């Protein structure tokens, strides 16, 4: 009773005074009380939907309504609750407040609930959001110019220009000079000057001592794997099953056949006949080399009836350079290989061919696949026996740096390049769409967003070279074979001579750009005049650019500053939450990069990836090898082994192949032999109506699948037949000197360097597609392609019938045909054997003779090159 009377008396006689409304009451009595008795439940946890850490939060209230009504303590839920006058709300739970504390709260509410900002609150409300929105993109983990603005210590340390802050002195603080834009060179942020109010707030903060309270970050959300997620087939350990016995001897010699035959019997299907020897050799030669078997090779193979004749032919093809060119192209499809960067100006990457050739050579050497993967993820961190191997390992990291650069300023949009890297790593090496977890937990697969950013931190701790960008066209962070320091020493005198020209060129370019932004009224100055001056400067600097010594460089990855990354809310780099330790997907073990590790984590990633206990890499690549031989994988979605992907048609066979692949030293060539020597591979492609009724898609392989030649096979084969194909290995494309790259969004790089070599060596641009490759469903340097679609369009037919290339090649082949035979039947026989890889049937001879009575031999050859027997492999 005494307490209620005291409170009523206080409210009755409390008068509004200047002192009551001053901040002292809040700072001395109210804030400490709220922190001590209320914040445990009513800050981040927001019990009852109520926060009590700001005036706005109190006015907003929680589930029961506003906590206070300024000027009306008797109507305020907060006062009713702490005074225990509310019917249900009695606060705080630990016990009633002292009457004087209740009186202070009531007085404070009566006087308008004044809530002056503390230095901490001022920083959190007025300063930190500005830094996060305008500075952290460049001066967070990226530490542009050596400066980080993620803590007071980092700001005091500063970067290359010196300390960013001088607490108490806004005039001397580089940060303030930069945002006021009264510094000679520092003008920040790059996107435009901040508002006067924002600059004033920053200045006040610095003047008051630059108080920077430590803000505890949010916790990484807990992700609990469900039993059904853990039990999904692709995440299970690889176990090598015993091959089932077949009741037909020819289907009981090869484990591939035993598994296939068992499934055929289960489905009530009968295997078809074996392909004839000419068809079989043509099929295998295209499969392994991407080129047709010659008339002489086919004739010799048909005549050779020894039991090991086909195996010897396989060995010969696997030992040829053409094997690596064919199978290296498959891998280049997966990693979206290109010779340009992909930014708005599509800057060239002259060194990219080294990675391409590394891939081709790796297949030719039958490099173990696990080693192949380790070199591409962390080659620069692996031991090497000599300098040549060290350099080979470094070049291998082109897998990482081939990631696409995006936009006018790729450096500022680095996160998009990292997204491209992670997406390709997931699809290409694990068969998982990890990129779908960038903005939120994966909707179907057990991949939380934290897994995405655990990998993000690894690649964000890696240095990617820059090919140039519109406003800074000079390359950076290249890897020199002689080493960074030695290269700097060698290049210094050339850099010194070139520097004035670089500065002049940028000055002229900036002057030219000004005409886009504002009117220039200086007499005699116009956009055209300045452009002419700019092009002259660029012409004048060429001799200085070309004077540089040709130091060997690679488009390679290297170690950056190791750090963990924060989860980006909806994939927005400027809106981050919890910090995630670098590591690997939870469903595959969830191991973390050790805290003691001083590197990026790429080495640990490469080791985890290729651990035989990891079930995905071997399964994925075994399935892809099968796909390239049969036109369809055991898992039809060759880069998606997740919930939304296709289920395996032969799960036991897939596990057998994966286990066998690892047992055989991760060898591609041994896997080829296992598959090609099977009855399954050697089946004819002819239809069996009874089987088609049950299995129209041939999912269970009762026949071989007929496949169209891909874009490279078509052009390479035609050139080989005409005698114009250069079989030597390709090298660097004839790009201009890299110090003269002045490409921009509206004048991007374009080029199409014609070459007589195989198509795999052709220059592949990202923004401008090769019209021929695009027409015949060729590779896209912007997207991973483990499966190429096979379309049939009228434009393809028009190209085959009317293009200059086809006309010229047909004429060259005709010259060879006319020289090879003196009679019409002999020439027809030569044409069929050379172009179709078989002898003509009697009806085909008659049709050909009738055709030749009306049209010349060139038209005959041209029509054969445009026909299905040439364009398809049975």
Tell me the role of every PLM-derived stretch.
Residues 34, 131, 425, 429-435:
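Short metal-coordination and nucleic-acid-contact micro-motifs, chiefly zinc-binding Cys/His arrays
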Residues 19-106, 110, 114-203, 212-256, ...:
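Solvent-exposed helix-loop boundary motif
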Residues 4-15:
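Bacterial N-terminal signal peptides
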Residues 247-322, 336-385, 418, 445-446, ...:
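Primarily short, surface-exposed interaction patches in extracytoplasmic proteins
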